Amino acid sequence: MTLKKVDANPSTLESSLQELKSDETSRSKINFILFLADNDPTTGQSWCPDCVRAEPVIYKTLEEFPEEVKLIRAYAGDRPTWRTPAHPWRVDSRFKLTGVPTLVRWDGDSVKGRLEDHQAHLPHLILPLLAPST
């Protein structure tokens, strides 16, 4: 039906999450965070081959869902930034990221499901994340 995308980075993700929380319509919608690597300015493509493979599959799967889906695309930074052990999303207890891409079903203030880098490109694993939360 409709896939609404919002872009964020380590300094803007919290405000994007607060907007989701305060938006009355978002509370009844399906919300995701897709943690990605930044695009390489010299090529225009992500420096992460798994992200390049997963992004189109994720977008297509979410766009085909009959209900509105909101997706925050959270860009982790360039390769050296992401590789830093103290990266904010690696140490944040809500996310505990170990790789990109990571697709997270976000409900309220918490993770309700996730697919790690080696799973995020598989539609048959994305679809169960779209099921109603309990």
Swiss-Prot record:
Keywords: Disulfide bond, Electron transport, Redox-active center, Transport. GO terms for cellular component: cytosol; plastid. Gene3D superfamilies: Glutaredoxin. Coiled coil: none annotated. Residues 1-134 form the Thioredoxin domain. This is Thioredoxin-like protein Clot. Disulfide bonds join 48-51. Belongs to the thioredoxin family. Pfam families: TXD17-like_Trx. The active site is at 48 (nucleophile), 51 (nucleophile). The keyword Transport applies. GO terms for molecular function: protein-disulfide reductase [NAD(P)H] activity. SUPFAM superfamilies: Thioredoxin-like. It comes from the Eukaryota. InterPro entries: Thioredoxin-like_sf, TXNDC17-like, TXNDC17_dom. Probable thiol-disulfide oxidoreductase that may participate in various redox reactions.
